Amino acid sequence: MKRILAFVLVVVFVFALSGCGAKEAKKDIFNLVEKNYDAIVTACENKDSEALLAINGIKEVDIVDGYVLIYCKGAGIAPSSQDYGFYYSEENLPVGVFDGQIVCSNSELVDYENGYRYLDSGYNEFYTEHIKGNIYFYSTAF
């Protein structure tokens, strides 16, 4: 029993030090966008997923209906997982994003903290916040 407790405490400690939290992920993504803003905007305007994937910190790119959806990181195992990234909106409108798809429109979002939130009927939460220009941060909890 003591070994199991010690193992659990070590795992919790390692995750605490690794910056796996939502605030750290958000800060990292805001910094990534700020540092690479011109390259990101140019690549998004040209729908150049290869140029985006060449930027350190970008893992996946999906282009859907005037949006370039960019996945950066995730944590956890469903049903307690979170994904983080950002997206470029041609019309500069926020939306809900999940798994490379748009899950809700601008009109379905409600004001929340510094951005907007959408809760679906399955208790999944989608949050988005303006970063700069036509670029928005997103997080998804599912």
Task: List PLM regions with ranges.
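Sec-dependent bacterial lipoprotein signal peptides
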Residues: M1-S18
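N-terminal export/targeting and maturation segments
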Residues: C20-A78
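Serine/threonine-rich low-complexity intrinsically disordered regions
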Residues: M1-K2, C20, N36, D48, ...
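Extracytoplasmic electrostatic interaction patches
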Residues: I63-F142
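A contiguous, well-structured "functional interface" segment within a domain
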Residues: R3, S18-A25, Y136
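Short, flexible coil/linker segments at or flanking structured domains
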Residues: R3-V8, D28, L119, Y123-F126
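Aromatic-enriched hydrophobic runs in primary sequence
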Residues: M1, Y37-I40, F86, T140
